[in-house]
Amino acid sequence: MAGTWDMLGTGGPVIVILALMSLLSLTVIAVKLIQLWPVRSGGQAREQALTQWKGGDRKQAQDSIADGKSPADRVMAYAMQALQEGLRGPLLQDELQRRGNEEVSRMNSLIRLLELIAMVSPLLGLLGTVLGMIQSFQELELAQGAANASVLAGGIWQALLTTAAGLLVAIPAAIAAGLFAARIDAAAQAIESAAGRLLLIDGSR
């Protein structure tokens, strides 16, 4: 623990900012993991519901996905209820599109923040390094040549510390943002597939 505080003191305010950004990034990653974990679930239940709907057992089809936790389950459940109430055609398609967009927008929340952290952290680290190098050379100049190589090397490694810290913050954030984006894309495709197949089945009956 003492080493961590020493590192924060050595890196100056830039390290403190990066530490706060790291804490924010880890918090966002944890929140998104909880939110996005179930978004690709329910595929088997939706297949069963579509089979039941095609066979004319609409009530059983609705019951099959009533407890679904994925966005595709929610959109399909709404579509089935709307069809039961007689809503069809462009009005239903527009409403399904709107609901699908809302689900995708909800899943995408905070992803931009992760991407921003991944982009800004290395730049902050580089800024800290540049400022540290400037300070080191200023101290060398004030020493008027009396400083030895070890003193100069100590100033340089302290300056490079912020670059390493910036990368340590950015890399997990970038990886998480990419993985989350891929999961969201798959969930969006599941929404489109579920709604489209239901409308196709209903229209062919």
Language model feature labels by segment:
Residues 12, 26, 61, 76, ...:
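Residue-level signature of catalytic and energy-coupling elements of molecular machines
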Residues 40-124, 131, 135-145, 178-205:
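Predominantly long cytosolic amphipathic alpha-helical stalk/bundle segments
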Residues 150-181:
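Pore-lining and gate-forming transmembrane alpha-helices of multi-pass membrane transport proteins
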Residues 11, 15, 103, 107-121, ...:
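Loop-to-transmembrane-helix entry motif
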Residues 1-47:
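Hydrophobic membrane-targeting segments
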